[in-house]
Amino acid sequence: MFRIVAVPEFSIQTVDARDPSSSEAAETLAALREKLSPRGDLVSPRGRELTLKVFGKALSPIEVVETICKDVQSQGTEALLRYTKSLDGAELTADTLRVPEEDLKAAHAVADPKLIETIGRIRDNIATFQSAILHRDVTITPRPGVSLTQRYVPIPRVGICVPGGAAAYPSTVMMTAIPAQVAGVDEIAVVAPPTPFGAYNTDMLATCHELGIKEVYRCGGAQAVAAMAYGCDALPAVDKIVGPGNLFVALAKKHVFGTVDIDSFAGPSEVIVIADESANAAFVASDLLAQAEHSPGSAILITWDESLLTSVQAELSRQLGELERGDLARDALSDFGALVLARDADHACELTDSFAPEHLQIETREPESLIAKIRHSGAAFLGHHTPVALGDYAAGPSHVLPTGGTCRWAAGLSANSFLRSGSVTQFDQSALSAIAQDVITVAEKEGLTAHARSISIRTE
């Protein structure tokens, strides 16, 4: 049920990119790409004030993260609790940091039965897809006496970051934990801010219990990432950290990479919608607003139909008044949104590849022909009846995706993200003798005579 909300007039930039010689259009699109690129220097006025209060001086976000990580690494639980108090306003102890199992059970008991039933169905969808794509061991015998295997082993212990600032995200628990469970991860630790939308949120805790997660900690931000990476008395170290978060979480994950593995360096959520004259303007506008309400969230329409662009602009204005978070979506559209007019479908695909968006939605008569021309997107949604929200909540692939143009080389989270691959090689004596001289020749050319000797000693 929608309600009418008073939203001030909004503006969204329109870009006519049809003229290849237009420097203005090229510069506008380049500036938008730069806005969406991973940055370590963008922080709100409130964030700057809090930094000054906690650290006693103005620090960049990167400097804040480096300080927090260093302190947690050297001081352990004491630093974790101190930063949880100063940054999140929660005074906890080593005993109250972890959510008791009784609280998880209690949250599950009072949760909306409809939510629990929904979690069950979504879990089946996610598990079905993730199981289907899971890597299996592969063994080949290229010649007699030789066995070559690529084996996959689940990462033993994983940490999951769940946001909890402006909203509760049980979907993030599902989209990270279920792929990990499908992969066979033994231990899963969830961290969430000590807020009403985080580790004190009934729906989030009930989701954890329904999925069999027993480790949930009331901490967030860079201090939680550092604790999971380095380990402390109250929170044992993990092997990999996944999940979304704010700028400080993203920078902290980047900082601890190498001590542990991470999924990606995530920024604001983003979508590009490619649409033609067959698209429903109301549908397109709703899809753009679905990303914009993340705030910050980027929403870009690329079309070669000028009348559709005009209709979508009108629909955005109308639908903003129906959204509870309409003011946030309006600001995001103003800062990170665009309506782009392309020359044709091929040009739209070129522009899309230049952004390498997190989400790509194609609302055209023949979406399959366009997706074949696009190389860079985290997740693609084809047709008029496949909104991104399906992928956010229920379809099966994980909604944890690379952003800020990193889809050019990074992949979204999946069950395979929680596997470590390794090879297993076995030769019998005859097979070794057949290849021995090749190994010896290369080893001697490199001056590694001990390598060569380890072969020849077995074949002489």
From Swiss-Prot:
Q: Where does this protein hold Zn(2+)? A: Q291, H294, D392, H451
Catalytic machinery residues:
E358, H359
Which reactions is this enzyme annotated as catalysing? L-histidinol + 2 NAD(+) + H2O = L-histidine + 2 NADH + 3 H(+)
EC number(s) reported in the record: 1.1.1.23
Identify the residues that bind substrate: S269, Q291, H294, H359, D392, E446, H451
Q: Which InterPro entries match?
A: Ald_DH/histidinol_DH, Histidinol_DH_CS, Histidinol_DH_monofunct, Hstdl_DH
Keyword Metal-binding found: yes
GO cellular component terms?
cytoplasm; cytosol
Write out the entry's keywords from A to Z.
Answer: Amino-acid biosynthesis, Histidine biosynthesis, Metal-binding, NAD, Oxidoreductase, Zinc
Cystine residue pairs: none
Q: Which Pfam families match?
A: Histidinol_dh
What's the stated role of this polypeptide? Answer: Catalyzes the sequential NAD-dependent oxidations of L-histidinol to L-histidinaldehyde and then to L-histidine.
Descriptive protein name: Histidinol dehydrogenase
Organism of derivation: Rhodopirellula baltica (strain DSM 10527 / NCIMB 13988 / SH1)
The lineage is:
Bacteria, Pseudomonadati, Planctomycetota, Planctomycetia, Pirellulales
